[in-house]
């Protein structure tokens, strides 16, 4: 039995691997490539150039690979690249890149993009990321591995969301979020670290304790960023997790949420 519903509209130049399933009324345009085992539900629109990897699942009414609404976009050829084992729930929108940046929007592996979330042009999403319902990322946003953005989180363009970080519901993020940090509010403020997430992912208690001390150095001792980073050099040499936290602050271009 065919896995392609006869009511789907698929451009003859689209490339679908073995065992790709396409539901009724979905539209797959030219320049779309879909890896094996991926399931495209009903009423989905896929626009190219877009490459989708293996064993993804895209739910109804999602729009994936559409042109960016950026006013600088003049129809140049840009891309969307999606990895493997992602779940893209109902009504999600993901836009391709712009030539003013990398000309590519990227979604890694094992991500959960929940209903009505938006991923803007040129954004880079790592692996094991969760975007909860109605989270919206503006253009050029980077989200590192294992970050969780709770429902209705808004992220300003060019922000960097660090690995293992967490945002509370309705948070408005306008600066970079360091790795492991938990932020809440509008505007966002740092509240703590994502200790529960660390424990669930098997971090040692020694590493968690070192990160707790590092957080206090940056956020609770009244130091400048330069002073805090200098104090973190020694623990960063001992604990790779602290080094990740330190690097996420050092490489910030928008300044960090404090």
UniProtKB/Swiss-Prot annotation:
Domain of life the protein comes from: Bacteria
Coiled coil regions in record: none
Catalytic reaction(s) noted: a (3R)-hydroxyacyl-[ACP] + UDP-N-acetyl-alpha-D-glucosamine = a UDP-3-O-[(3R)-3-hydroxyacyl]-N-acetyl-alpha-D-glucosamine + holo-[ACP]
Keywords, comma-separated and alphabetical: Acyltransferase, Cytoplasm, Lipid A biosynthesis, Lipid biosynthesis, Lipid metabolism, Repeat, Transferase
One Pfam family linked to the record: Acetyltransf_11
GO MF term list: acyl-[acyl-carrier-protein]-UDP-N-acetylglucosamine O-acyltransferase activity
Family: Belongs to the transferase hexapeptide repeat family. LpxA subfamily.
Function: Involved in the biosynthesis of lipid A, a phosphorylated glycolipid that anchors the lipopolysaccharide to the outer membrane of the cell.
Protein name: Acyl-[acyl-carrier-protein]--UDP-N-acetylglucosamine O-acyltransferase
Source organism per UniProt: Pseudomonas syringae pv. syringae (strain B728a)
Lineage: Bacteria, Pseudomonadati, Pseudomonadota, Gammaproteobacteria, Pseudomonadales
Gene name of the encoded protein: lpxA
């Amino acid at each position: 039995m065919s896995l392609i519903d006869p009511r789907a509209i698929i451009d003859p130049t689209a490339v679908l691997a073995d065992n790709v399933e396409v539901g009724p009324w979905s539209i797959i345009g030219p320049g779309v490539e879909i890896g094996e085992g991926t399931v495209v539900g009903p009423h989905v629109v896929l626009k190219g150039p877009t490459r989708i990897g293996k064993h993804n699942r895209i739910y109804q009414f999602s729009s994936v690979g559409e042109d960016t609404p950026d006013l600088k976009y003049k129809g140049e050829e840009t891309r969307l690249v999606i990895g493997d084992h992602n779940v893209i729930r109902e009504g999600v929108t993901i836009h391709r890149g712009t030539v003013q940046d990398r000309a590519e929007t990227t979604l890694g592996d094992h991500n959960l993009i929940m209903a009505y979330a938006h991923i803007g042009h040129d954004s880079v999403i790592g692996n094991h990321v969760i975007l909860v319902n109605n989270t919206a990322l503006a253009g050029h946003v980077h989200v590192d591995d294992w970050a969780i953005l709770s429902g209705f989180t808004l992220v300003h363009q060019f922000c960097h969301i660090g690995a293992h970080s967490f945002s509370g519901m309705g948070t408005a993020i306008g600066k970079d979020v360091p790795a492991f940090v938990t932020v809440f509010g509008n505007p966002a403020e740092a509240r703590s670290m994502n200790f529960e997430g660390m424990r669930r992912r098997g971090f040692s208690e020694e590493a968690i304790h070192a990160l707790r001390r590092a957080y206090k150095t940056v956020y609770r001792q009244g130091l400048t960023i330069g002073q805090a980073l200098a104090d973190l050099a020694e623990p960063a040499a001992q604990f790779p997790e602290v080094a990740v936290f330190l690097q996420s602050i050092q490489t910030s271009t928008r300044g960090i949420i404090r």
